[in-house]
Amino acid sequence: MKMVAISQELSSTSYPGRGIIIGRSADGSKAVTAYFIMGRSVNSRNRVFVEDGEGIRTEAFDPSKLEDPSLIIYAPVRVLGNKTIVTNGDQTDTIYEGMDRQLTFEQSLRSREFEPDAPNYTPRISGILHVENAKFNYAMSILKSNNGNPDSCNRYTFAYNNVPAGEGHFIHTSRGDGNPLPSFEGEPTWVKVDTNDIDAWTKEIWENLNEDNKVSLFVRFIDIATGKYESRIINKNH
């Protein structure tokens, strides 16, 4: 696999759907993550990210336009001790509750499947960052229909230990626009994290997401030595 710039990867498609990036800053001192949402329908575009404790949740920007909250209102980011959970749906809570009961990330997700939004059957994507004793590792998961067949769910977990400085991985729900939307395939994309600046990275991601379809972006940098973090949120609706 060839390592690619996140700007190039994002700008090459009009609709990557929802996406999670996790990696390590260029100087190796920060664990970094980003989560973005995009939308094609009025209901999907009518959203903002808001802070919620140590994490975030989605909210309707205009409550009068909210049609079906089931798949669009959720907490994408929650923190459990030294673990930061990032997902594209309410499986954030499933992982949080499972790991709180000593299940692993992968075990917690066994009770979940792709989203029931036929004919897309949008994959559920999840990530977890673990920062402890000045060490950092992470994992990613995708739960997807069996090539569009909703009768079976394919589950993939990717775990990354000791990732070098300046590298990361990117997983997203869709390979591009279409009807139905084509689900992500293969391993998470190997991407460069060529900065130590949270604002520069936030800008790089936001500016390379399709202007019509992008909705919100969350970025967090966690100091691996201390566990302290800083975050950024950008909402198209404001």
Predicted region positions:
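Conserved short alpha-helical segments that host acidic/polar catalytic motifs at enzyme active sites
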Residues: M1-H238
